[in-house]
Amino acid sequence: MRKSKMWRMLAVAAVAASMTCGVFGVQSVSAADKKTLKVAMECGYAPYNWTQPDDSNGAVQISGSSDYAYGYDVMMAKKIADELGYDLEIVKLDWDSLVPAVQSGQVDCVIAGQSITKERQQMVDFTDPYYYASIITLVKGDGDYKDAASVEDLKGATVTSQQNTIWYDSCLPQIENTNLLAPADSAPAMIMQLQTGAVDYVCTDMPTALA
C-alpha cells in the first residue's frame, strides 16, 4: 500500500505553527589550529539526516563507523566545511547528547531540527535556521483517527512523540483528554509505535512524516 494511503497528516492549529530545523549550537573554530569541522547529528532523522551503508549521493562516512550519513543536514555541513576550507567529520550521537557535546567541546557544532527555546539559548548559541517545518499529527490511514479534521477530533487518543522536543513537551499537552505515553527515544522509535498500533497518532514535523 502506498504511504499516501497509509498515513494521514493533520496540522495542529492550536499549537505552535512551525519549528526551526537545521539550527546550530556553535563554538568558535580557529583556522589556525583546526582543519576539521566536527558536526554532530542523530543520523537517524530522515529527511534531515540518516544512516546508509555507502557513500552514494555524496554521503559522508560517520566517525568511528563503516556507515555513512546523508540528508539535508549533511548537505548543509558539507557546504559550511567547504566555505571554511575544512575537512568534515560527522559524529553520530543520540538526540539528548547533541547539546552537551557542544558544551563539552566534543564537537564544534550540531546541525539538527531543534526549536530555538529560551532553555536551549542558555546552553548554546544558535545560527539563523535554514528551514522552518510545520508541526503536524500523523495518524494511520486505517486507524480510529483517520477522519480527524481538527484538534477537537484528536481527543481521547493514546499518543506520544520524541523525547525533549516541543512536539512532546509543548504540543501534545495542549490536546485534551489524551493518554500521553512516555516519549520515544528517537524519531524512528516514535514512528514504530504508530506502525505497531501502540499509539493512535504521533506529533512530529511535516518532513519527518513524509519521509
Question: Which residue ranges define each predicted feature?
Answer:
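Bacterial N-terminal signal peptides that target proteins for export
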Residues: 2-13
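Bacterial N-terminal signal peptides
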Residues: 12-22
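Sec-dependent signal peptide cleavage junction
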Residues: 20-33
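Extracytoplasmic small-molecule ligand-binding "clamshell" domains
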Residues: 34-114
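Bilobed "Venus flytrap"/periplasmic-binding protein-like clamshell domains
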Residues: 43-46, 66-82, 114, 133-191, ...
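Short, hydrophobic alpha-helical packing/hinge segments within bilobed ligand-binding/sensory domains
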Residues: 76-77, 98-101, 107, 189-193, ...
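Acidic, polar ligand-binding/catalytic clefts
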Residues: 78, 87-153
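A ligand-binding cleft/hinge motif common to bilobed small-molecule-binding domains
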Residues: 96-97, 113-123, 170-174, 195-211
